[in-house]
């Protein structure tokens, strides 16, 4: 008997199943298909020819064997394998049809996302302020490209999972659970049928009184102990497959609950709005230009628009700016290096502070002029 076609189908099921499903498939192939094909055929090949009765009445042995085994053990197990694998084969056909119907653009997009490399980071050079101060008659680039080193994000994207997320993403979860339920029902049904037909033991002799036997005759079975052991093994394999089906259902249920909780927690985290962070050295530059309530004076700020700086504050700012400018001029005269001077002017904290205070002064003057015009009207 050839099992190649069924084996190829079961191998395709392995690509669309969970980790527990792969274990079930291994048990099915090794302990059911191979064991039934190899061990069953060799053990039960002479089950009827070696079934002898202590009579020479024609037809009596055939009738007694039919009463002893209404269905051959091997044929029963082959029929069991076919019915149990039918839901999985139907699921495989549906999965292949569902995946084939997906748009080609979506498939190409997924492949492009996997194979896409990170684009280089383009930004303004960090040392451009200092390079501009160089008088080397060379044009410095305004932007520079920096290739970001490959991180272990691919490992994070390729999280090790047992195929449950892939089944869910392909929209096959309901069909997968349905075929698990059918498999479990078939397992229970065949376990009960095997017990009703054969029990847990192959008896060494069978008493038969059917027609056309002239009287009650005793019939003897070949290798009853070996057949009993093989029968118990098939009981254990069926129970193991049923247990794996129940474990897989439990695993899918727990995984679905975890995904729901994780999605809810992610939505809560996304709903919390984070305050925008200021650029580097922003607060250090504007720390002197704060209002009495602690907010910086900045155009567009609703609080600063209604704030008018007093006259004595304006005078104090003018004096401070004048004094700071004198200190800077004195420092520049003492240091004749134009490069250092230009770099100091462009990047020194004092120059940044003076620029910020000058902006404050201009803003305050504009506010004062505007308020005087309104009062004059």
Curated annotation (Swiss-Prot):
Compositional bias segments (type: Polar residues): 344-362
- Whether Chloroplast counts among this entry's keywords is no
Annotated GO biological process: cell-cell signaling
Task: Write out the entry's keywords from A to Z.
Answer: Cell junction, Cell membrane, Gap junction, Membrane, Transmembrane, Transmembrane helix
Q: What is its main location?
A: membrane
| InterPro entries to which the protein is assigned, alphabetical | Connexin (IPR000500), Connexin_CCC (IPR019570), Connexin_CS (IPR017990), Connexin_N (IPR013092), Connexin_N_sf (IPR038359)
Cytoplasmic topological domain: 1-18, 97-174, 250-377
Q: Which PROSITE patterns match?
A: CONNEXINS_1 (PS00407), CONNEXINS_2 (PS00408)
Is Transmembrane helix there in the keyword field? Answer: yes
Quote the Pfam families the UniProt record gives.
Connexin
Indicate, by first and last residue, each region the UniProt record lists as having compositional bias (Acidic residues). Answer: 131-151
SMART domains documented for this protein: CNX (SM00037), Connexin_CCC (SM01089)
The terms describing its cellular component in GO are: connexin complex
User: Residues on the Extracellular side?
Assistant: 40-75, 198-228
GO MF, any single term: gap junction channel activity
Q: Cellular location of this protein?
A: Cell membrane; Cell junction, Gap junction
* Region annotation Disordered: where it falls in the sequence: 129-163, 266-286, 341-377
Oligomeric state and interaction partners are given as: A connexon is composed of a hexamer of connexins.
Query: Could you tell me what this protein does?
Result: One gap junction consists of a cluster of closely packed pairs of transmembrane channels, the connexons, through which materials of low MW diffuse from one cell to a neighboring cell.
Q: Which family does it belong to?
A: Belongs to the connexin family. Gamma-type subfamily.
Recorded protein name is: Gap junction gamma-1 protein
| Gene that this polypeptide is encoded by | gjc1
């Amino acid at each position: 008997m050839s099992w190649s076609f069924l084996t190829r189908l079961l191998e395709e099921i392995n690509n669309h199943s969970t980790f527990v499903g792969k274990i079930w498939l291994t048990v099915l192939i090794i302990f059911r298909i191979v064991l039934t094909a190899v061990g069953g055929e060799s053990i039960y090949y002479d089950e009827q020819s070696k079934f002898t009765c202590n009579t020479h009445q024609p037809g009596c042995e055939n009738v007694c064997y039919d009463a002893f085994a209404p269905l051959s053990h091997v044929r029963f197990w082959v029929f069991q394998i076919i019915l149990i694998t039918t839901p999985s084969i139907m699921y495989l056909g549906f999965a292949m049809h569902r995946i084939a119907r997906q748009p080609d653009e979506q498939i190409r997009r997924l492949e492009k996302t996997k194979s896409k490399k990170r684009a280089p980071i383009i930004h303004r050079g960090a040392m451009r302020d200092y390079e501009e101060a160089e008088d080397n008659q060379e044009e410095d680039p305004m932007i520079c490209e920096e290739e970001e080193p490959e991180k272990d994000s691919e490992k994070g994207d390729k999280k090790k999972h047992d195929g449950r997320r892939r089944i869910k993403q392909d929209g096959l979860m309901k069909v997968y659970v349905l075929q698990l339920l059918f498999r479990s029902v078939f397992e229970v049904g065949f376990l009960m049928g095997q017990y009703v037909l054969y029990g847990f033991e192959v008896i060494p002799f069978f008493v038969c009184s059917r027609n056309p036997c002239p009287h009650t005759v005793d019939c003897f079975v070949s290798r009853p102990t070996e057949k009993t052991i093989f029968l118990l093994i098939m009981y254990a394999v069926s129970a193991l497959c049923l247990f794996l089906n129940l474990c897989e259902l439990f695993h899918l249920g727990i995984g679905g609950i975890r995904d729901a909780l994780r999605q809810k927690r992610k939505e809560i985290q996304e709903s919390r709005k984070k305050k925008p962070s200021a650029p580097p050295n922003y607060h250090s530059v504007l720390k002197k230009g704060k209002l009495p309530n602690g907010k910086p004076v900045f155009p567009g700020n609703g609080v600063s628009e209604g704030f008018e700086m007093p006259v004595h504050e304006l005078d104090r700012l003018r004096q401070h700016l004048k004094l700071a400018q004198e200190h800077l001029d004195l420092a520049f005269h003492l240091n004749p290096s134009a490069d250092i001077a230009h770099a100091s002017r462009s990047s020194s904290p004092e120059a940044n502070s003076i620029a910020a205070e000058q902006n404050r002064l201009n803003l305050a003057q504009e506010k004062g002029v505007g308020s005087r015009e309104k009062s004059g009207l």
